[in-house]
Regions:
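Structured secondary-structure scaffolds
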Residues: 1-197
């Protein structure tokens, strides 16, 4: 992880302190530890190796790879198999990952480590001889959480401010204003109906 730690330190001037602090803090406090990339599950992407039945890839190992693999598949489906390189091997390309605080480490440290670790074999196969390194995230402007009346917003518990319902009662401009002034940029915030009204 020394390369990832350096990568994070190099972004201190323009990444949010919370993103740098959480990612770099985890690396510095825990050190470089092996992480399992499989789970014993009956759902998910099965490990395609005989004898590994019942093992699936850990969602955060394979999910971030989806950014790259989806772009490669898109290029192939659209008849220009090399088109993905315009983003993934172009030093001018800038990838931004807008996420919530619970996914910071995976996008700010884990994913860059995977990209750094792909190595020459991948690049020779996909990008060609002497291919450019893969594009690392330019910024990960992660937000903290916005709660509702001091409770975690949850779709499965039907606890939230639903846009369609909101717009039947109120104009969108007050919503835009309230979300702007209460945005959880550096700390968790709370939607409070009394404050909104």
């Amino acid at each position: 992880m020394p390369n990832v730690a350096r990568y994070l330190r190099d972004r201190k001037s323009y990444w949010r302190d919370t993103v740098i602090g959480q990612s770099l803090g985890q690396i510095e406090s825990e050190g470089l530890k092996p992480r399992a990339i499989t789970r014993d599950l009956d759902w998910g992407i099965p490990v395609p190796i005989q004898g590994w039945e019942g093992k699936c890839l850990y969602v955060w190992f394979e999910a971030v790879i989806g950014y790259l693999s989806a772009t490669i598949e898109w290029a192939q489906v659209n008849g220009d198999a090399a088109a993905w390189k315009e983003w993934w091997t172009n030093p001018q390309a800038k990838a931004f990952h807008f996420i919530g605080k619970d996914n910071i480490f995976f996008h700010a440290a884990w994913w860059p480590a995977q990209l750094m670790g792909t190595g020459a074999q991948f690049l020779e196969i996909y990008a060609g001889e002497g291919g450019q390194p893969l594009t690392l995230p330019y910024d990960v402007p992660a937000n903290m959480f916005m709660n509702l009346e001091n409770r975690k917003i949850s779709g499965s518990h039907n606890w939230g401010v639903w846009g369609r319902d909101f717009l039947t009662r109120y104009d969108p401009d007050p919503l835009r204003y309230y979300l702007t002034v209460t945005m959880p940029e550096n700390r968790d915030t709370d939607w409070n109906w009394d404050d909104f009204l």
